[in-house]
Amino acid sequence: DNIIKTHPDFNTFAGASVQIPKTVVLCTDVFDQFMEQNNLYQIALSDASDDEILRHFLHAQLPDSLIADFFTFFEAVKCPIAIRSSSLLEDAHYQPFAGIYSTYMIPYLEDKYAMLEMLACAIKGVYASVYYKDSKAYMAATSNVIDQEKMAVILQEVVGKQYDGRYYPNISGVLRSLNYYPIGDERAEDGIASLALGLVKYIVDGGQ
């Protein structure tokens, strides 16, 4: 948002509007509460398979206090919703975790209770992905300690268009809170974004 405000030239493109999609963040305290109230650390830190860990997480309960907020978000967003990870380690300088954890997308439905069920499953799936075998292996390879990882979750409208019954995102990207190579009047704390047409897999996989 700061970059958009300080670069008015973003608004000079005919037929295009550059703005931040509607977004809700579930902070790390929700993750802590979910893990502790459902006693999930034992299975999460075990050698259980990814499927077994996911099964336990899907059977767990999210805090009831979130339900009203989810319905409010559904009223504000009339398109599919991306459910993305936002962990403490994903913005690390030398060992970023971007692309390690799961991301989900749910469709927009008139049945808001069906959306609520899908959203809850997606959030639990993001939480579970912290403890999958690939995540643990990457954690060990980068000399990080898994029980110190904290997970926030971002709920964000997917801006795009529908073609032949399928919904396609316009542009996706990876945001970094620090830009280590600022140019001109830019500051490191302004951050930087890597953008690509469609889904962000191209960038996360190392595309330039």
Residue ranges and their predicted role:
Residues 1-12, 61-208:
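Conserved mixed alpha/beta core segments that line enzyme active sites in large multi-domain catalysts
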Residues 1-46, 50-64:
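A conserved helix-loop-beta module that forms one wall/lid of the active-site cleft
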